[in-house]
């Protein structure tokens, strides 16, 4: 791998799937093989404006509940800012980018979970214009197990408090989209952390960059 062949890699998964530890592993792998740390992003978030939008999406306001359509549009507003002001400039400068979630999350959560796929696809096409990661690692986990893990971290946010069937629909959408796109690799996140990390490293080492 070289800095000149900079790529955009994303880690996806339901709550409690182990994204944080996977991202740390991939970050170290990229730095070791390129000599440079990747630009790390999270969604929603990653720019000052996008972080403010993140708070609107994540924190419930009983006095003004966020409707599903507003949630979708806010997330895409944050993503548009991040892509325009961070991700594309970083790639243009030869820097690898490592993302904690990207467009696949919206397709799964808002498209599958909320049942808003036509809106999600329309806004995705309008804002991203075909821009997508070079590789997405989807950490697949039963939603019940994932939420149990997430609950151990502390208080659940507005998204994490959704009913289990929301996450089941999101998972089904993740798996369907992964089956249709060779750039999305499914990792069994029900394994031990060591096994998950072994599988991730195998994918990274096998890719012809």
From Swiss-Prot:
It catalyses: dTMP + ATP = dTDP + ADP. GO terms for cellular component: cytoplasm; cytosol. The keyword Ligase does not apply. GO terms for molecular function: ATP binding; dTMP kinase activity. NCBIfam families: DTMP_kinase (TIGR00041). HAMAP family: Thymidylate_kinase. Belongs to the thymidylate kinase family. Phosphorylation of dTMP to form dTDP in both de novo and salvage pathways of dTTP synthesis. This is Thymidylate kinase.
């Amino acid at each position: 791998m070289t800095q000149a062949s900079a790529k955009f890699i994303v880690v996806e998964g339901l709550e409690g799937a182990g994204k944080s530890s996977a991202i740390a592993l991939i970050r170290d792998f990229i730095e070791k093989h390129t000599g440079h740390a990747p630009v790390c992003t999270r969604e929603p978030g990653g720019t000052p404006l996008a972080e403010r939008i993140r708070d609107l999406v994540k924190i419930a306001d009983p006095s003004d509940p966020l409707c599903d359509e507003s949630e979708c549009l806010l997330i895409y507003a944050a993503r548009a800012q991040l892509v325009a002001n961070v991700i594309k400039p970083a790639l243009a400068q030869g820097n690898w980018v490592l993302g904690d979630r990207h467009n696949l999350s919206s397709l799964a959560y808002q498209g599958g979970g909320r049942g808003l796929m036509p809106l999600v696809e329309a806004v995705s096409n309008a804002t991203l214009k075909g821009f997508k990661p070079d590789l997405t690692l989807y950490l697949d986990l039963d939603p019940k197990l994932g939420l149990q893990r997430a609950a151990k971290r502390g208080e659940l946010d507005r998204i994490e408090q959704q009913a289990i069937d929301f996450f089941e629909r999101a998972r089904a959408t993740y798996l369907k989209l992964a089956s249709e796109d060779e750039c999305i690799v499914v990792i069994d996140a029900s394994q031990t952390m060591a096994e998950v990390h072994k599988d991730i490293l195998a994918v990274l080492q096998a890719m012809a960059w």
